[in-house]
């Protein structure tokens, strides 16, 4: 526990003498004033003086001892106990009253705040008296928690019982120990809490000098429990010490206590010194700490810390009992007012202050004893200078008169008594004595300004501190001081000499020792150096060995990489061969399908009418019963996969039974080879697990056993009633025969790929149950016309078979997951799914009872005539149904009665329809060599692109006997017959594939009749139904003939695929052929690219395809069409115009509109076709990914030519059964763009086995196979070698099944021709100068040499500007003359100007020419007789005061101006008024006389007479004054007199020709100098341009504009264009001009206006609604001669067939853009031949651009056009010749030598000329970089037009522009990979070394290489 705290606690219980001392001191006026001044300072609590020996120091006055004794006596008299008690009671009463007022005021404010916060004032109003009565618990709790003054102090912790108690306080009052620092900190905090004063934050010194006390209430300490002691010092307010034992513990007045002083900041040197900041070691802490307690309690008190002052250093004096007893009656320091612990424990202001001890108890300590060495004897002070004498004391050493004369201003009352003044003086003297005592001991150094800040915290002695307080006055040095200083210097020199000698000796000794040590350790050092050298050599050897081994590893690695490369090349070649074989097989299937369709239809039209006729609109579909799910709800993918795996096993069994039953049923084939030949044409359509399965395998028997059990189950269920029949009927309407293929996204760049995933679309029906249908029983489904026109709502479950364990391509996509989680739309979709599922389930429940009625309705429909059914379901009724080819209908009916009711599929299903899904662990072998067809073409079983036939019978389980195949002689077809026999032991699935032979035997007829008898009436109704269908088919067979025979025999025979009846309008022949090709893609499960040239109707063909699928296939969607934003509405209008039966959803708009359009998104019949844009499909990709699209169609598919774009990657992940790309330019820049399109169609890739080909080639393989060789061949321009021709042929073979491209010249015979010409134009003189000057610039040379791409493109753009027009590069300047104001006049001194101005104004003011009569000619407008008459009538003399009266004598003096009397003032006023009137009338009379006396010199009459002479000469346009005079006579010379305007007009040509060169400098304001004094602004006529005749010539000489004709003559292209436009206009042609730059359009506008041609303009700034108006106006108005447009905005989407001549002012890098511009005029609707002229500046960069464009055209010609990707190719080239020699590209031996100017014709549709020029191979992806660089360097207008065009054509293309990093990455990817080993230069050198040691067998290198090869697993991870 703290000793100081205990002593302070005990001080409150001292005798009353102590309290009296304190009270007297406090109440003394002077002392109280001093206390008030020092209340902001906190001094430590200390005892009072008890010894009178310690008085006031005598340094202030010689008589200080006498004054001190008198003051002490006065103080002693005032310290009586009675006076102290009276003053104390009075003070207590006052403080209690003040405290009560404070508490009442505080309580009132708190209550008002409570009412405001609780809004009580607003309800009841504020009443202070009523608020005082509010003592509710809520208020008391709120007041206690927030505004209780007692809570401001921290709680006092519990004091342990074991704490020691000091002699001055109880044991339980305070903690065990408190240091001075802690006590001081607590005193500071308590002082701020009890009496807060606005003080800046201060820092109190701590033990380490770095603790910051400041504003922190709880300082953190690191001592032994000091933190706890600090917290325990502050007592709890709840413990309040007001009522203590015996009432002795009282707390003094807070307001009278001295506040803690601000702690100084140690960082500020200029601040005051901290209290006790320099602790003095001479003060014994025993004296300072425990004197009071020892005196009171017998010297047994412990040391206590000081509260308000920091720690003092402990004195080194011994603390003995004797010392303690000796000073027991002494005190360390007097007590100063400060908050004590008693006050803290009892914060109540009602307590009495702690009394101060008396002087007797607390004497001053003696002065510290200092031992000083002094000079013995008296010291004589000698002054060597008068200034050294001390100054005389002020005021004569006596300040009594000054004190007596002191008067206090505040003392307004009577002067105090002498006793009161003496008491005050005693108190103040006491305080001053204490202060001086403390200063002498260094205790109050903080109150002293210290000049030297460096000694702020220094620990100096007491004498030094005292010396700083009482400074010795400065004096000058004398002789004695100099002598002492010299002695000090000599002494220092002697010491230095004494120190230097040992140092020198040590240096010498050290050198000798080093010498001997060097000799002694020489051998050891040499040994260590040798050892170090050996280690170094060993490390070098090891390093060289490692390097050698690393070299060996590199060589072996290079060999292995080379072997891997060779193996990869081999596998790649095999892969390419497999891909080519697959393409061949697919194309073979298409060709044979078309041929078979033609043959079949031809035979049908000429064969006997007794043949069974199948319907055109109903199809037979064989589906296992397990594929019909009883609950058709889209569930989890895992469940789908499990179900599908079961289907795979069952279908595998069925395929095995197909083969065996077919072998048994065939009469013409007896061995397996024959069967293999018969079925080899189905290898591309049937899975390889069926083709390659061994019939004798054990697995087959196991499956047969299971099939047998299934057959038994089927037999058992035969007698269950009509349930199987009902199931078949329901399946006929709800089933689907489509087998869908889902393509999952695949990494195109990866070298490995998964096997393609096929999905089987399973038919699901709510009415079919597993209990009533066997698991493996197949059923025949008939699809009625109702299914086509009114499709039923059904759920389709997709099961994906893939090698991947994840069937969903988006299931592992984190971005897709995040979007699904964050998307609110997905939650709505899920809710919609649940609602729709509930609706479907409810429909299924309600439909269970209506099943029988529906079946009866279907059977009733079978009895209706075919005409009624056709009308009911929307089919047109054909004419001529009764007979075909002249045969009666009865014969046909008779033949149908003889036909067997077999289950026949007349049209072979597509590849995936008949193919059974292969297991996930098997590899597709359908495209291997063993699966390829033989060269011999057997009778085909594939009918591709033909309409499906209607099944005429439905099989029922009532058939107990096996069905036999009967029929007439027709082409062989595949018939799938359901065979149910109980005793069949070969297989049990009942599926037999047999070949239908010639029909004519009686046995077959008999068997058929027997079968009909068993079937009963059901077959009768079906036969009647089929008769009507046969009639319809016979009527339609007239149009169904072979497509190839149409061109040779009849031109009006119907197509294979009929035009959908929902399609309005008639397709053109080539459009019908395109529809058939698209239908064949669907039938063969293929994707394709419709790449017809622009203007051939790709949109209508696509719409027709969707109509065909809906009408003929029953596939209504849903389809997704992605188009550019600008043509969304165009597609919608095309659908409404040609196919209004399809429900179309145009998905566009903002987010809210799209959300509204997604209402019913999952409802099947809400819409069938969704049309959206590329931008929206990316924004809502998470919505589109979730749907399984039937057909995904991409318009303008070249938008996905970049496989790195987000658009390509996003669309690749969509689920779609089929994909179709529409583009007019499938190949624009390079082959890799074509690869992007093809890979998008076939994203399968390569599997683990190179022979398992299920998809397309990856990026690297395609580049190595095709891109690199063909690019090299195109760029070199040499003749095609055999290898290149073979590569081209392979590429054609690869692309032919997937691309259909027709040119307008091929399909539109009536379309006029198109001819292209290149016009070479010479550069003008100015163009050549600018071109050469730009090329010779250093900056241009630097840009070309450094190779910076942007710099090169900027150079290219500037050169193109020069070639187009020099004004684009540098405008002709408008020349003006240099003109400025007079410089000398502007710089004249201001004072001269001021003087001139003042003088001018003075002259004008003083001199008035008119007033003095100097205006001689001013009155010439007046007539003479008027002036004379005016003088006659002058009446000036008649005015008042005109005649002055005669006066005699002197004039009377004027009266004086006297204001003292009224009479004199009135007299003066009368006189003044009279004088003023006289002067006024005199002025009026003089003015009147002057005005009446004015007269002209000649007069207007005389001048008019002289001006009207009849003989003067004037111009004819001047109006004469006397017209009657001129009518009499006109001078003969008058016509030669011209006016000034006429003269200026006649000289306009001369002025225009010669006033063209303005002078270099001209002078201004010549009129001012020529006519000084004439201000033009005062005469408006002078500023009128009509008045200024020389205005035109002056302006021509001031500014010179370029001549308008220079616009044409400065440019060679415009000169040529002027000539050609003149000729074309005379011949009646109309012109279309395209350019890339918007500024060129401005120049063309000026050019056309200058030459008088009418034109229209269209650029990027033209609004979309105005474009259609412009095009229609140009096409309809033949007066408009020219239409100018930018190629970027006018090249897409407009029709300009009114023009027959197209000019390309500049060429584009991409030739496909120019072709699009050409097609604006050369399209359907053009009636004249179209000529295209391309302007090229000779000997410029444009020639190289044209050459590069020709290379791209050549590449497109070789790859696309010569490939023959059209329908005619099938007729020209047989399918056997697909691998034959393909005619190569014609080699052009020579190139026409271009002259400087001329026109060269180019064969537009032929092969472009490959010029033999040396051109470096362009970087891959150059076109995109080029377009971006051109956009950066071209003009702002062109860039703006390009952006707007891009937004119209490709609205969202700019979002997928790749940055520089992506471009650099793309360049690295596109760089051709080296075919050699990737060995560095060092590896190459190693190869030479190996060859060098080849002649030495067994060399080290061979050994190392052999070792590395043998143990390659160990060396493979090693890297040098």
UniProtKB/Swiss-Prot annotation:
Family to which the UniProt record says this protein belongs: Belongs to the SNF2/RAD54 helicase family. SWR1 subfamily.
| Keywords on record | Activator, ATP-binding, Chromatin regulator, DNA-binding, Helicase, Hydrolase, Nucleotide-binding, Nucleus, Transcription, Transcription regulation
Q: What does the function comment of this entry state?
A: Catalytic component of the SWR1 complex which mediates the ATP-dependent exchange of histone H2A for the H2A variant HZT1 leading to transcriptional regulation of selected genes by chromatin remodeling.
Q: Which organism is it from?
A: Cryptococcus neoformans var. neoformans serotype D (strain JEC21 / ATCC MYA-565) (Filobasidiella neoformans)
Lineage per the UniProt record: Eukaryota, Fungi, Dikarya, Basidiomycota, Agaricomycotina
- Residue ranges of every copy of the HSA domain listed in the record: 467-540
Basic and acidic residues: compositionally biased ranges: 208-219, 701-726, 841-852, 1037-1055
Q: Region Disordered: what ranges?
A: 1-68, 158-350, 590-727, 783-862, 876-966, 988-1055
Acidic residues: which segments have biased composition? 597-619, 634-654, 662-674, 823-840, 994-1005, 1012-1036
One molecular function GO term is:
ATP binding
User: Which proteins does it associate with, and in what oligomeric form?
Assistant: Component of the SWR1 chromatin-remodeling complex.
Q: Has UniProt tagged this entry with the keyword Cell cycle? A: no
User: In this protein, which residues make up the domain named Helicase ATP-binding?
Assistant: 1079-1244
Q: Where is the composition biased (Low complexity)?
A: 167-177, 324-339
Span(s) of short sequence motif DEAH box: 1195-1198
Q: What EC class is this?
A: hydrolase
Q: Which PROSITE patterns match?
A: HELICASE_ATP_BIND_1, HELICASE_CTER, HSA
Per its record, how is this protein called by name? Helicase SWR1
Q: What is its EC number?
A: 3.6.4.12
* Record domain Helicase C-terminal: where: 1613-1766
Cite the record's Polar residues compositional bias ranges.
1-31, 56-68, 900-929
Classification via Pfam families: Helicase_C (PF00271), HSA (PF07529), SNF2-rel_dom (PF00176)
Q: Where does ATP bind?
A: 1092-1099
Q: Which GO terms describe its biological process?
A: chromatin remodeling
Where is the protein localized? Nucleus
The reactions it catalyses are:
ATP + H2O = ADP + phosphate + H(+)
- Which PANTHER family does this entry report, sorted A to Z? HELICASE SRCAP, HELICASE SRCAP-RELATED
């Amino acid at each position: 526990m703290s000793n100081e705290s205990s002593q302070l606690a005990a001080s409150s219980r001292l005798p009353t003498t102590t309290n009296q001392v304190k009270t007297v001191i406090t109440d003394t006026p002077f002392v109280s004033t001093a206390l008030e001044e020092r209340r902001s300072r906190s001094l430590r609590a200390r005892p009072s003086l008890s010894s009178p020996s310690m008085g006031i120091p005598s340094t202030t006055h010689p008589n200080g001892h006498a004054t001190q004794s008198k003051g002490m006596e006065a103080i002693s008299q005032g310290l009586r106990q009675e006076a102290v008690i009276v003053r104390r009671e009075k003070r207590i009463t006052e403080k209690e009253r003040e405290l009560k007022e404070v508490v009442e005021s505080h309580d009132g404010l708190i209550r008002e705040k409570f009412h405001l916060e609780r809004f009580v004032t607003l309800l009841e109003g504020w009443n202070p008296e009523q608020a005082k009565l509010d003592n509710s618990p809520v208020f008391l709790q709120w007041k206690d928690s927030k505004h209780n003054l007692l809570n401001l102090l921290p709680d006092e912790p519990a004091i342990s019982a074991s704490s020691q108690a000091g002699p001055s306080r109880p044991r339980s009052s305070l903690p065990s120990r408190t240091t001075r620092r802690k006590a001081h900190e607590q005193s500071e905090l308590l002082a701020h809490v009890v009496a807060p004063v606005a003080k800046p934050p201060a820092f109190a010194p701590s033990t380490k000098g770095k603790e910051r006390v400041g504003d922190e209430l709880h300082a953190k300490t690191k001592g032994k429990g000091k933190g706890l002691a600090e917290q325990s010092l502050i007592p709890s307010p709840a413990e309040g010490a007001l009522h203590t034992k015996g009432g002795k513990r009282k707390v003094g007045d807070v307001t009278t206590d001295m506040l803690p002083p601000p702690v100084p900041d140690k960082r500020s040197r200029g601040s005051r010194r901290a209290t006790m900041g320099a602790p003095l070691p001479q003060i014994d802490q025993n004296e300072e700490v425990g004197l009071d307690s020892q005196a009171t309690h017998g010297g047994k008190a412990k040391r206590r810390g000081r509260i308000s002052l920091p720690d003092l250093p402990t004195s080194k004096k011994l603390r003995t009992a004797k010392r303690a007893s000796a000073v027991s009656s002494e005190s360390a320091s007097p007590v100063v007012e400060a908050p004590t612990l008693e006050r803290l424990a009892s914060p109540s202001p009602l307590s009495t202050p702690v009394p101060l001890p008396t002087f007797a108890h607390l004497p001053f300590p003696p002065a510290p004893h200092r031992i000083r060495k002094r000079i013995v004897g008296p010291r004589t002070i000698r002054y060597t200078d008068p200034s050294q004498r001390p100054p005389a004391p002020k005021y004569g050493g006596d300040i009594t008169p000054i004190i007596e004369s002191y008067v206090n201003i505040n003392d307004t009352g009577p002067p105090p008594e002498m006793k009161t003044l003496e008491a005050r003086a005693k108190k103040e003297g006491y305080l001053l004595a204490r202060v001086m005592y403390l200063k002498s001991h260094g205790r109050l150094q903080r109150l002293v300004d210290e000049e030297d800040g460096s000694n702020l915290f220094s620990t100096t002695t007491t004498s030094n501190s005292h010396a700083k307080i009482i400074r010795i006055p400065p004096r000058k040095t004398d002789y004695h001081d100099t002598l002492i200083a010299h002695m000090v210097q000599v002494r220092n020199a002697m010491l230095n000499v004494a120190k230097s000698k040992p140092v020198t000796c040590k240096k010498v000794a050290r050198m000798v020792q080093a010498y001997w040590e060097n000799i002694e350790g020489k051998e050891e050092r040499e040994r260590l150096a040798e050892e170090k050298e050996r280690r170094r050599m060993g490390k070098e050897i090891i390093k060289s060995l490692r390097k050698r081994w690393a070299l060996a590893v590199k060589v072996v690695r290079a060999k292995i990489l080379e072997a891997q490369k060779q193996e990869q090349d081999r596998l790649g070649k095999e892969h390419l061969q497999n891909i080519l074989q697959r393409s061949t097989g697919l194309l073979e299937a298409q060709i044979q399908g078309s041929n078979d369709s033609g043959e079949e239809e031809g035979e049908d039209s000429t064969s006997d009418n007794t043949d069974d006729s199948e319907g055109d609109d109903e199809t037979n579909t064989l589906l296992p019963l397990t594929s019909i799910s009883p609950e058709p709800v889209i569930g989890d993918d895992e469940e789908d996969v499990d179900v599908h795996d079961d289907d795979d096993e069952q279908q595998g069994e069925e395929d095995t039974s197909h083969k065996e039953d077919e072998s048994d049923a065939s009469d013409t084939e007896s061995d397996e080879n024959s069967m293999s030949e018969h079925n080899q044409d189905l290898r591309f359509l049937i899975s390889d697990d069926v083709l390659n399965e061994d019939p004798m395998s054990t697995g087959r028997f196991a499956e047969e056993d299971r099939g047998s059990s299934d057959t038994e189950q089927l037999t058992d269920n035969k007698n269950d009633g009509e349930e199987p029949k009902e199931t078949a009927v329901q399946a006929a309407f709800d089933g689907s025969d489509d087998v869908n293929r889902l393509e999952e996204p695949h990494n195109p760049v990866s070298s490995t790929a998964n096997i393609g995933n096929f999905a089987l679309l399973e038919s699901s029906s709510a009415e079919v149950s597993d209990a009533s249908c066997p698991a493996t029983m197949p059923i025949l489904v008939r699809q009625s016309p109702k299914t086509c026109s009114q499709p039923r709502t059904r759920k389709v479950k997709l099961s994906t078979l893939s090698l991947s364990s994840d069937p969903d391509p988006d299931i592992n996509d984190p971005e897709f997951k995040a979007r699904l989680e964050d998307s609110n739309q997905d939650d709505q979709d899920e809710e919609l799914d649940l609602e729709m599922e509930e609706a479907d389930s409810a429909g299924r429940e309600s439909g269970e009872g209506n099943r029988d009625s529906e079946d009866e309705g279907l059977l009733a429909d079978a009895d209706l005539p075919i005409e009624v059914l056709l009308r009911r379901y929307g089919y047109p009724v054909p004419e001529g149904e009764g007979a075909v080819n002249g045969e009666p209908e009865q014969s046909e009916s008779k033949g149908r009665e003889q036909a067997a009711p077999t289950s026949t599929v007349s049209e072979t299903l597509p590849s995936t329809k008949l193919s059974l899904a292969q297991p996930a662990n098997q590899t597709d072998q359908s495209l291997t060599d063993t699966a390829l067809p033989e060269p011999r073409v057997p009778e085909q079983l594939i009918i591709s692109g033909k309409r499906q036939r209607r099944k005429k019978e439905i099989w029922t389980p009532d058939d107990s006997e096996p069905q036999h195949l009967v029929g007439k002689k027709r082409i062989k077809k595949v018939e799938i017959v359901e065979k149910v026999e109980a005793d069949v032991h070969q297989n049990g699935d009942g599926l037999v594939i047999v070949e239908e032979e010639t029909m004519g035997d009686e046995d077959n007829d008999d068997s058929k009749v027997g079968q009909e008898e068993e079937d009963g009436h059901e077959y009768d109704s079906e036969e009647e139904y089929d008769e009507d269908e046969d009639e319809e088919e016979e009527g339609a067979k007239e149009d169904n003939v072979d497509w190839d025979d149409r061109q040779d025999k009849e031109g009006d025979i119907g197509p294979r695929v009929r035009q959908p009846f929902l399609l309005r309008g008639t397709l053109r022949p080539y459009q019908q052929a395109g529809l058939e090709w698209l239908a064949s893609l669907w039938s063969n499960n293929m994707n394709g690219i419709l790449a017809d040239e622009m203007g051939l109707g790709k949109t209508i063909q696509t719409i027709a395809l969707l109509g065909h699928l809906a009408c003929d296939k029953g596939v209504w969607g849903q389809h997704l069409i992605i188009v550019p934003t600008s043509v969304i509405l165009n597609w919608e209008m095309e659908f409404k115009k040609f196919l209004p039966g399809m429900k179309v959803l145009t998905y566009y708009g903002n987010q809210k509109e799209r959300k509204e359009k997604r209402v019913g998104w999952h409802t099947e019949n809400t819409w069938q076709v969704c049309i959206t844009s590329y931008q929206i499909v990316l924004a809502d990709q998470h919505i589109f990914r979730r749907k399984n699209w039937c057909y995904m169609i991409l318009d303008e598919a070249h938008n996905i030519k970049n496989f790195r774009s987000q658009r390509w990657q996003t669309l690749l992940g969509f689920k779609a059964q089929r994909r179709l790309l529409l583009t007019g330019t499938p190949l624009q820049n390079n082959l890799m763009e074509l690869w992007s399109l093809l890979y998008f169609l076939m994203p399968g890739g390569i599997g683990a086995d190179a022979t398992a080909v299920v998809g397309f080639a990856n990026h690297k393989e395609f580049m190595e196979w095709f891109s690199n060789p063909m690019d090299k061949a195109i760029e070199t321009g040499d003749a095609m070698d055999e290898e290149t021709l073979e590569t081209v042929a392979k590429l054609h073979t690869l692309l032919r099944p997937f691309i259909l491209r027709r040119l307008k010249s091929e399909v539109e015979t009536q379309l006029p021709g198109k001819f292209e010409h290149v016009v070479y134009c010479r550069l003008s003189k100015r163009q050549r100068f600018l071109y050469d000057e730009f090329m010779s610039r250093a900056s241009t040379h630097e840009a070309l040499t450094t190779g910076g791409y942007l710099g090169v493109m900027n150079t290219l753009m500037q050169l193109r500007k020069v070639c187009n027009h020099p004004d684009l590069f540098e405008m002709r300047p408008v020349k003006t003359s240099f003109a400025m104001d007079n410089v000398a006049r502007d710089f004249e001194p201001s004072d001269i100007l001021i003087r001139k101005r003042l003088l001018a104004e003075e002259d004008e003011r003083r001199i008035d020419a008119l007033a003095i009569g100097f205006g001689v000619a001013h009155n010439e407008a007046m007539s003479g007789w008027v002036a004379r008459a005016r003088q006659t009538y002058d009446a000036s003399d008649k005015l008042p005061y005109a005649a002055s009266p005669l006066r005699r004598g002197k004039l009377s003096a004027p009266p004086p101006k006297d204001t003292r009397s009224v009479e004199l003032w009135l007299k003066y006023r009368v006189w003044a008024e009279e004088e003023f009137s006289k002067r006024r009338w005199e002025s009026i009379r003089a003015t009147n006389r002057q005005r009446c006396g004015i007269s002209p010199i000649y007069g207007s009459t005389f001048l008019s007479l002289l001006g009207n002479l009849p003989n003067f000469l004037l111009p004819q346009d001047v109006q004469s004054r006397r017209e009657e005079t001129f009518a009499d006579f006109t001078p003969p010379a008058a016509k030669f007199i011209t006016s000034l305007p006429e003269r200026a007009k006649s000289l306009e040509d001369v002025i225009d020709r010669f006033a063209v060169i303005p002078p270099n400098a001209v002078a201004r304001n010549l009129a001012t100098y020529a006519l000084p004094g004439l201000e033009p602004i005062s005469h408006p006529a002078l500023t009128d341009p009509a008045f200024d005749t020389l205005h035109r010539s002056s302006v021509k000489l001031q500014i010179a504009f370029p001549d308008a004709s220079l616009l044409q003559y400065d440019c060679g292209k415009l000169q040529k264009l002027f000539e050609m436009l003149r000729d074309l206009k005379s011949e009646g042609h109309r012109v279309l001009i395209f350019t890339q730059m918007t500024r060129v359009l401005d120049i063309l506008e000026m050019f056309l206006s200058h030459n008088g041609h009418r034109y229209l303009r269209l650029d990027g700034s033209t609004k979309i609604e105005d474009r259609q108006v412009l095009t229609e106006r140009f096409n309809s108005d033949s007066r408009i001669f020219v239409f100018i447009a930018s190629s970027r905005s006018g090249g897409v989407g407009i029709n300009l067939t009114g023009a027959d001549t197209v000019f390309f002012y500049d060429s584009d890098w991409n030739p496909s853009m120019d072709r699009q511009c050409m097609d604006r005029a050369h399209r359907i609707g053009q009636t004249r031949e179209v000529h295209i002229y391309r302007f090229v500046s000779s000997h410029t960069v444009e020639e190289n651009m044209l050459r590069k464009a020709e290379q791209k055209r050549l590449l497109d010609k070789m790859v696309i056009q010569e490939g023959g990707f059209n329908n005619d190719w099938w007729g020209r080239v047989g399918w056997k010749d697909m691998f034959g020699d393909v005619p190569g590209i014609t080699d052009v031996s020579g190139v026409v030598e271009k002259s400087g100017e001329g026109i060269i014709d180019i064969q537009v549709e032929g092969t472009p000329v490959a010029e033999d020029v040396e051109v470096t191979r362009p970087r891959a992806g150059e076109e995109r970089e080029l377009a971006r660089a051109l956009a950066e360097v071209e003009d702002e207008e062109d860039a703006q037009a390009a952006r707007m065009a891009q937004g119209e054509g490709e609205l969202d293309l700019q979002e997928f522009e790749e940055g520089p990093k992506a471009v650099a990455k793309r360049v690295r990817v596109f760089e051709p990979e080296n075919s050699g080993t990737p060995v560095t230069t060092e590896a190459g050198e190693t190869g030479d070394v190996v060859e060098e040691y080849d002649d030495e067998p067994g060399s080290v290198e061979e050994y190392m290489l052999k070792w590395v090869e043998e143990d390659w697993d160990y060396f493979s991870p090693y890297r040098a």
